[in-house]
Regions:
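Structural signal for interior beta-strand "rungs" in well-ordered beta-sheet cores
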Residues: 37, 103-292
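Terminal amphipathic alpha-helical/low-complexity segments used for targeting or macromolecular assembly
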Residues: 1-107, 112-113, 150, 156-157, ...
């Protein structure tokens, strides 16, 4: 556990001390005490409803309201909310705090029955590869990646690297945010050529690919996404950050599932579709932006007829 008083900077205002084990967004379900940030009363209310939130980082004009809202939560006011929050995350990922915040490194473990091409690059720590898994030449596997049994990782794929998380800090440039989460790949998963699957951002969180899922070449899966079991993802699809794909889903070629969108079990996202809203279970969506497939086709036929 880390106390707010341990990490407060001189220009911050600590209204009430508190303890946290991780950082996260205000609605995160982490199963551990979190420090989150709230930029306005709406997000403050959301954070107060989340039992995992133990400490609050807020702007100065929200400090008193946050302190009075719950006497059991720690509160710290800061001048540059989002930047201060993610700079703190980066600081906690550094050598002084990493063991308390992100855990200790463990040696990489590869099952003796796995078939690893010698031209593969595998991090020396925090990687686990299961029985009978095949990793082809040119694949790169970063730390904090666990691959189950009987998987196939084809040439050129990059697993467990950092994702897109940057903060603009005005004239000072752009702040890159450390990725200290993990990537968990189930059993009998195949990831074909030149795919990218990023690990998650926060240490307690993971990007996840379920058992028996098959991913064709040139697919991008962003940080924090959860892919279910027996999912088929065709070439050049893009799964954006924190998307949730259910079981037995079809994701068509060149399609996009937007950030935080949920695709229900047995749903289909067709060729080139852009799913910017949740996709109900057992439905099929088409188009940009994606709508119900039958409605899309009816509209298309009307246009062809000049109606």
């Amino acid at each position: 556990m880390i106390r707010l008083s341990e990490i407060c900077k001189e220009e911050w205002n600590l209204l009430r001390d508190g303890e946290f084990a991780g950082l996260g967004l205000c609605t995160a379900k982490a199963g551990l005490p979190l420090l989150t940030f709230c930029g306005n009363p709406k997000f403050l209310r959301m954070a107060l409803k989340n039992p995992d939130v133990a400490c609050l980082m807020v702007p100065f004009d929200l400090a008193q309201q946050a302190a009075e809202a719950d006497p059991l939560r720690g509160v710290c006011a800061v001048p540059n909310l989002r930047v201060d929050f993610f700079e703190l995350h980066n600081r906690l990922c550094g050598p002084e705090w990493a063991e308390r915040y992100a855990g200790t490194d463990e040696p990489t473990v590869i099952d003796p029955s796995a078939h690893i091409d010698p031209r593969t690059v595998i991090a020396p720590s925090n990687v686990s590869i299961g029985a009978n898994t095949v990793v082809e030449a040119g694949a790169v596997i970063y730390g904090r990646t666990k691959i189950g049994a009987d998987c196939i990782i084809r040439s050129g794929s990059v697993l467990g690297g950092s994702g897109l998380e940057f903060m603009r800090i005005g004239s000072e440039g752009i702040l890159g945010v450390e990725h200290r989460g993990s990537l968990m790949i189930g059993n009998r998963v195949e990831i074909q050529y030149n795919c990218n699957v990023s690990r998650s951002l926060f240490p307690w969180h993971e990007t996840r690919i379920g058992d028996d899922t098959k991913i064709e070449s040139l697919v991008h899966i962003a940080h924090g996404s959860h892919i279910g079991k027996r999912v088929l993802i065709a070439a050049s699809a893009c799964i954006c950050g924190s998307a949730e794909i259910g079981d037995d889903v079809w994701i068509g070629p060149n399609s996009t599932v937007s950030s935080e969108v949920k695709v229900g079990n047995n749903a289909r996202v067709t060729l080139g579709a852009v799913a910017a809203a949740d996709v109900p279970a057992s439905s099929t969506v088409t188009g940009n932006f994606a709508v119900d497939h039958e409605l899309f086709m009816l509209d298309h036929l009307r246009k062809m007829r000049g109606e």
